[in-house]
Every structure is written in C-alpha cells, then in structure tokens.
Amino acid sequence: MNATQEQLKIKLEQALVAAFGDEYAGVDPILVSASNPKFGDYQANVALSLSKKLGQQPRAIASAIVEKLDVSEICEKPEIAGPGFINLKLKTAYLEAQLNTIQADTRLGVPTAKHPQREIVDFSSPNIAKEMHVGHLRSTIIGDSIARILEFRGHDVLRLNHVGDWGTQFGMLITYLREVSPEALTTANALDIGDLVSFYRQAKQRFDADEAFQETARQEVVRLQAGAADTLHAWKLLCEQSRQEFQVIYDLLDVKLTERGESFYNPLLPTVVENLEKSGLLVENQGAKCVFLDGFTNREGEPLPLIVQKSDGGYNYATTDLAALRYRIQKDEAKRIIYITDAGQANHFAQFFQVARKAGWIPDDVELVHVPFGLVLGEDGKKFKTRSGDTVRLRDLLDEAISRAHADVEVRLKAEEREETAEFIDKVAEVVGISAVKYADLSQNRTSNYIFSYDKMLDLKGNTAPYMLYAYARIQGISRKGEINFADLGDNAKVILQHETEFALAKYLLQLGEVISTVEEDLSPNRLCEYLYELSKRFNAFYDRNQGVQVLSAEEPLRTSRLVLCDLTARTLKLGLSLLGIQVLERM
C-alpha cells in the first residue's frame, strides 16, 4: 500500500466511525486500485460488506460514509457507483505535489521499513568439487534480488552461502586423487576445475562399484573429521580451488555472499542430537536416531521419520540444517530466515522446520520461510540440458548469452551505420547478456517452470531486460540531445500534468513504494519486473511522437515539467533494475 492509499484508508476508517459509531473502528474499508481509469484511481468496497450487519442497502451505507469523508486535499468529490462502490479520483494538484516531493528524494518516495530487523537469506549453495550449473542460476539471482530489496528497505541482511563442503564425497575424492593425481592434494591449483569435476565423477563410479575403495574412502572421512593434517590440507586446497571458480561466476553476476559452509556447523552436530534427546523427541529406529513427524507418511500410511543420526553414528543434511538453524537464531539473532531452493526440497524444509518447532527452538518473533522455485526447461519443454544430455554449466550459459548479445549489438550498429569502440561493444554485450539472463528468470512467477530461450530474452521488444535498458538509454539520449543535466533541473522544477499520457505515467511512478513493499512481504521479484515493464510502456506512450507529447520542443514551463517526468522515469528504472541486480547503460 502506497502513502496515498494509507492516507485514504485512514480517512475512510475515520468516516466509518463518524457514520456508524466506535464499534466500527478498525473495520477494513477494502480500498483497492480502480480496475478501470474511468472510475477514478481507487475504489472502496466496504459498503457492500457491511450491508447485512447494518441491515441497510449498500448505496445508503456508501452515502453515509461519503457524507463524513473529508478527502478534499487529495481527491475530487467522491462518487458512488453501481451497488455501492465509493470511487475516488486523485486531484491533479495532489498528483503534481507528490511528484515534486519524490523528485527531491533520492529514495523516490520509498520509505524504509517501520521495524527493520536482522534477516538471513540463504541462497546459491553450490557443492565443492562440482561446477555451478543451470540449477544454481535461479537460487543465486532470486536470492540476490530478495537480499537487495530487503537491504533497500533498511533491514540488516546476512547473505549466506551454505556450500556443500563436508561429508562422504571428500573421503571419496581424496582417496581417488591419492591414486591418480596426488599432487592435487598438496599443491594449490594443480588441477583445473574441469579435471576436478571429472575426477569426482570417476571417484563416484569407483565408490559405487568397489567395496574396498568404499571402506578406504570412509576411513578418509574419519581422518578428515579427526583433523589429520594431510587430509585437512587436501580438503582445504580442494575447497579453495572451487571457491575461486565460484567467485568468477559471482563477480560476473555481481552477487555478494558470505560463505558459511556445512563444515562450519560440524562441531555443533552432537549438541543438536543431545538437545533433541533431552527434549524427548528422539526415537531409535533400526539403529538410527530420528524424530517422527506429523503429517508425513509413507506409502503404507505409517509416520515418516526425519533421521538426525545414522546407525553408524554419522550425521546427514537434516542434522546440519538443524544446527545451522539454531546458530542463526541464537548467535546471528535473525528474526526472519529465508531459504531459496528448488521446489523439490519443500518437504525437507517442512520436516526440519517442524522438528525445530517441536524442540522449542523457534521463538514467536522468528519467521522461517522456504522460497521455492521451479525448473529451467529447454525449448523442448524438458529439463535444460546440453546436446549430449549433460547439465548445462552456468559459466557456459552466461558466456553464450554475452556472445549472442555481442552479435546483436554488431548487427544493430551496422544497420544504424554507427561506429563504436570495441570496448563499448564488449561492455554493452556483457551488461545486456547478463541482464537478459537475470531478467528472464526473475520476471517469471518463481514457483513456475520456465523455458530458457536466448532469442526471447535478448529481444528488444516485450517484457525483457533489453527493452527496459533501451527505455533507460532512450531517456539519457533526450538529456544528451537537449544538452540537459537532469540533476540541474533544480528544486524549482515543477510538474504540470495536462496530457492523458502524462497522467498515466505520473500515477504509475507513484506506485513504486507499494510494489517494493509487496515484494518485501511475499518475496516474489517478478512483481517488480511487471511494474518496471508497465512503467516502460507508459513512458514510451508518453514519448511516442504520434500519441504522446513534445518534450524538448515544448514551451516552458511544460518543457521542464516533461523533463522532470523523464528524469523520474529514468531514476525509477535505474533503482528498480538495481534491486533486480541489473546494471543500466547510458548508451546502447
């Protein structure tokens, strides 16, 4: 809800009490944006909901409310429509004043949260000794965008990368490398990441087929857990090599993360089991220690357990996640913990959240949220793979997007008979390519699967990053053409609204705060994408040479007013795109 809606809501609540008495204090006036501009800007539907309780016709109730409603500073005279809708149309002077206010505000009228708090966003989380693949794309960019929005709202955000850096796979890999490439266990970067991944696959095949190898690998894990110097050194080298590779991707995506892998919580695992035992939740089942869950059953209808200690005394992902959760509440003092993973892990989160609640670890003021997302599909509608059937490496995917953007830029420059430096072309291609990949993902409802298409995401038309980047660059072109520095327009530059496209643009500019507040609450960045796309369309209609208005050639004070609208649009696009992790371009 934006500031204008907040004011109108309060005034409607006051009118309700004035019309029908104190017992109606706090009744929701059901104020919504009007579905059709011809009915005004907002519509209050409370009269229909009170008809039965008051024993009156909705129109009579609406009339009584309107009689006590004072919105003269904000709206034209309220109108009652249909069965009892109260329609409210914003005054032109009010709209102009609001725009002048946000013009002078670096935050464009978006307030910080009333109650800022410590929030943890757990995202990306690749595995050591494996390359980041297309499956990590969604978690990484959705998590980054959510973190950016929460930070902008003033929350203290801890961005955590829960990397898979511990467990059986290291015993397996170290055992295999001792045989085939021992120098990789003593010398930094003796292998490149591709070789490391290949050796990991070979080690897994040996582990699955060779019992003697299995036993040696398990002993290596025991040595790692005991802190044996040579094994620990090898583990650190492998982790550091993967970390360097991950950082190349994070730098390309402009993503900031604090790494805190599974190994961090390893010393805390016995305490988790001990605490659950003391609370009476642990049950021994076939030698394993587990907690039986409410609402989870197997095919036979029997309760499903969550295993927290295996029969051999080892731990698993659930134990680590429980330890991490306790630490984040007790030590990090988080009030909301947000996990960004694929929808396939929904049951896992529901299960260990339930165990933590049963154990009494979750205070009333702490919220746990799993943010699930769907799959990335190929254009054949199946899981996105390479032609050979392998998982798509994230680095390859990003490089391909940049390469295609590079080719598009060169074709466009040739068509326009424009010459630019190689440095300019490379910069534009990288920004457009990375932005296109990010925006194509973020603009989807995150719970849905989506089809990955380079052609669609790089299109200059439609709901794409290039369309948005072009709208921003177009406004900067107006500035250059008119030799105007928008920052020099000054506090005396006033907005004057006359043309219908100006009104449509102005009203939409004032909705930014409402949109960001919604994303903060429901953690769906696609809502911000939708807003920016609609804003770009409204700007293009405003600036259209046939249907829109003249800007640079207009007479004063309209010229300055329209330049302010251009500036506000550019600043809103830049801010909104930055919250999606997308960089703008002054020229394209």
UniProtKB/Swiss-Prot annotation:
PANTHER family: ARGININE--TRNA LIGASE, CYTOPLASMIC, ARGINYL-TRNA SYNTHETASE
Family: Belongs to the class-I aminoacyl-tRNA synthetase family.
Lineage: superkingdom: Bacteria
Gene Ontology molecular-function annotations: arginine-tRNA ligase activity; ATP binding
Name of a matching Pfam family: DALR_1
UniProt name for this protein: Arginine--tRNA ligase
Subcellular location: Cytoplasm
Broad class of enzyme this protein falls into: ligase
Gene Ontology CC: cytoplasm
Motif stretch ('HIGH' region): 126-136
InterPro entries documented for this protein: aa-tRNA-synth_I_CS, Arg-tRNA-ligase, Arg-tRNA-synth_N, Arg-tRNA-synth_N_sf, ArgRS_core, DALR_anticod-bd, Rossmann-like_a/b/a_fold, tRNAsynth_Ia_anticodon-bd
Gene: argS
Catalysed reactions, semicolon-separated: tRNA(Arg) + L-arginine + ATP = L-arginyl-tRNA(Arg) + AMP + diphosphate
